[in-house]
Every structure is written in C-alpha cells, then in structure tokens.
From Swiss-Prot:
The lineage of its organism: Bacteria, Pseudomonadati, Pseudomonadota, Betaproteobacteria, Burkholderiales. Residues 180-194 have a biased composition (Basic and acidic residues). This is Urease accessory protein UreE. Residues 171-207 are annotated as: Disordered. It holds the Pfam family UreE_C. One of its GO terms (cellular component) is cytoplasm. InterPro entries: UreE, UreE_C_dom, UreE_N, UreE_N_sf. It is found in: Cytoplasm. Keywords: Chaperone, Cytoplasm, Nickel, Nickel insertion. One of its GO terms (biological process) is protein folding. HAMAP family: UreE. The keyword Cytoplasm applies. SMART domains: UreE_N. It comes from Burkholderia lata (strain ATCC 17760 / DSM 23089 / LMG 22485 / NCIMB 9086 / R18194 / 383). Belongs to the UreE family.
Amino acid sequence: MRTLDKRIAPNVKLAASLVARAPTLTLAYDARCKSRLAATLDTGEDVAVLLPRGTILRDGDVLVADDGALVRIAAAPETVLRVRAADPLTLMRAAYHLGNRHTPVEIGDGYLKLEADPVLADMLRRLGTQVEETLAPFQPEAGAYGGGHKHGHDATFAEDYALAQQVFGEHHGHAHSHSHSHDHDHDHDHDHQHGPGCAHGHGHDHH
C-alpha cells in the first residue's frame, strides 16, 4: 500500500498536464481534516494518508506518495446547509453567531454554507435566514483559532465561547481580574504593566 505523506505547498506551481494525469482522492470535509487515514483513490487503489498533525486538505491540493507519484485532492459532495438572507445585515448577523461557535463556514457570494446540523439550522431560521439542505462540496474558510471544528450541540461550546471572549477581551483592552500572581519571567525586556490595555499571551481566569 502506498503512503501519501507530503503535501505540495499551495504557492508551488505545477504543470497543469502533470496534475491532470494524477489520480484523484475524493474526500468529504471531515476526512480532509484527518492527518492519518486509510482511503481509496478514485482508481480503486487503497492508500494510507500520513500527514503532519493539524493538516486540513483543500480541494485542488496535491499530495506526494512515498514512490514520488502525485495524487490530487477533490472535495466530495456532502450534505450541507446553504444559508441566504433577504439583506446583507441578516446574513452578517448569522455569520457572527456561527463564528461565536467556531463553526466552519464557507463564505460565498450572497450565501453561507456549513455542515448540516439541526441545532444550527434552527438558530439560523430564528435569525431570519433561509436555510436549504443540499448536496455540495464543502470548502470552509481557514480557522483563526485552529483545532477541530465544532457543532452547535457540542458540550465544549461553553469552553469555546469563553476562549473567544478571552481573546476578544485581551485584544480590545477590556479590564478583567487576574487570579494568578505575576511573578513569572517574561521573555521581553520592556516594563510589564497591567493597565487597561494589557494584552499579554498567558491565559486568564474570568469571574
């Protein structure tokens, strides 16, 4: 069994004819988020995918097998929610609430697209959007926080929301209490002051 263990950087331009001759590995979004999996090429050949942890494959990516051959990644059609609204403000509000939940979202011209989730579908309808379940490839925006993706009903939602609020507070100078002592060393050489604009990188407990 061949192993696909390298991804060619997106900024590396390959000859179109070379990519066109490469066999295709068609994967849904969940599978493209896995750095290690057994998969089957569209030719029927079984392969192993072994990539650095945290790798998320996108439609059009090119992988290199351990024998030097190329394999092209394609996004498989899957069940998704296509979200539209009568006005841009309503769609922006929907995007804001999805972002608060760290939900992977594909942003298109006049629509949002996300994985099918009944909890999120209900929330989006309550916000005044039109939600349509359809079958289509899913290509969400790259995440700002990293890590796995979350659904509206995940038990970790409260933790994610707290993290988002913490990051927001640190980068916008919001005052907050500190429950830990500040006797640790800092690797910068300027005075360390805890004023309203404090935005240092260690975690804070919020009360």
